[in-house]
Amino acid sequence: MASSSPDAPCSCDCFVSVPPASAIPAVIFAKNSDRPRDEVQEVVFIPAGTHVPGSRLQCTYIEVEQVGKTHAVILSRPSWLWGAEMGANELGVCIGNEAVWTKEPVGQGEALLGMDLLRLALERSSTAQEAVHVIAGLLDRYGQGGSCREDPEPFCYHNTFLLADRTEAWVLETAGSLWAAQRIQGGARNISNQLSIGTDISAEHPELRSHAKAQGWWTGQGLFDFAEVFSLTQQPVRMEAAKARFRAGCEMLQRHQGNITAEVMMGILRDKESGICMDSGGFRTTASMVSVLPQDPTKPCVHFLTATPDPSRSVFKPFIFEVGVSQSPQVLSPTFGAQDPVRILPRFQTRVDRRHSLYRGHQAALGLMEDEQEQAQQLRKKQQRLEQEGLEALRGLLTGEQTPPAQGLGSLFQAFVEREEQAYA
């Protein structure tokens, strides 16, 4: 039987800043992906594609109908699955997802994972609003379900999403195939493993309210509060931690209101006291991402990804969709084809080593940082200098002080990955 208990350790935090909350004329997106401690997250570049009409697409567990054209995407994903925890496409759409439990039962059947929905939306959408509708359509047609971890004991949940583009952001929260969405055209917003959309609903499933009435969750009188109606009546202890992280995230965003930058978002993702930078028992922050999406369409979007666990001891490296962009082999996990435990039924009966090259180097460095204080300080300084170079490159691009050739921008992420790996050698 699939486990759907909210008491199981699982947490994520997503943030977005839309002008005037941002210090610059840009939307800024950020996410910490909190996953099983030993799970490896890889960074994968998928080029744009043209596909045969009517062809089928294999996702993590099920096939869906492919569309004619797909956008190029950069994904940070658990290396055993098809979808992604967070990512962006070439048009500047960013999405992060989170686990959520509601009054709607979590199905045990295999369908689309929330992470599959995320990737499909990035590949098929040109705006955040379009991505909301893509996910809603896929939910209606295929549903969501299946184990979300690489373990013989299934672990299932529904999903919430934070979606952003160059002009605005959306929060999309689901309960089975039902959903509600909220548009954010200014200010800062965060989500943390709980329903957070109240009465301010910008779009919703056509049967959302009638279903709530039929279940006896809403009388039909007064304002319809999505979070109040669909949240579990008796909140488990685990959800109290999510509430605390949500409040802490709100407070940090409010503290920096009008002055939010990529550096501010990175600082929030590194905050251990709040639990946003997670390291608890069998779970931890396994990868992080911050994206800067300028409102000026002539300026490139810059996506910073760690590809390694614990952002407080990792490097945010800049990725830009430009000429010459390709897959960085150092952050790509090995593949196992038909022998992969996710492909053999029953699934996940064995374990394989999915660590990529940068993960191995970083893992060794973390061990050193815990044992040797002096060397740890030297290594952390190297990480900070490298990250600062990436942030300075971002500032130069946004101000127009730097106009490097497109080929150079396309290979920027690869160059930073190589330098980080050298620092760990």
Swiss-Prot record:
It comes from the Eukaryota. The active site is at C12. Signal peptide: none annotated. One of its GO terms (biological process) is proteolysis. Pfam families: Peptidase_C69 (PF03577). One of its GO terms (molecular function) is dipeptidase activity. Belongs to the peptidase C69 family. Secernin subfamily. PANTHER family: SECERNIN, SECERNIN-2. This is Secernin-2. It comes from Mus musculus (Mouse). The gene is Scrn2.
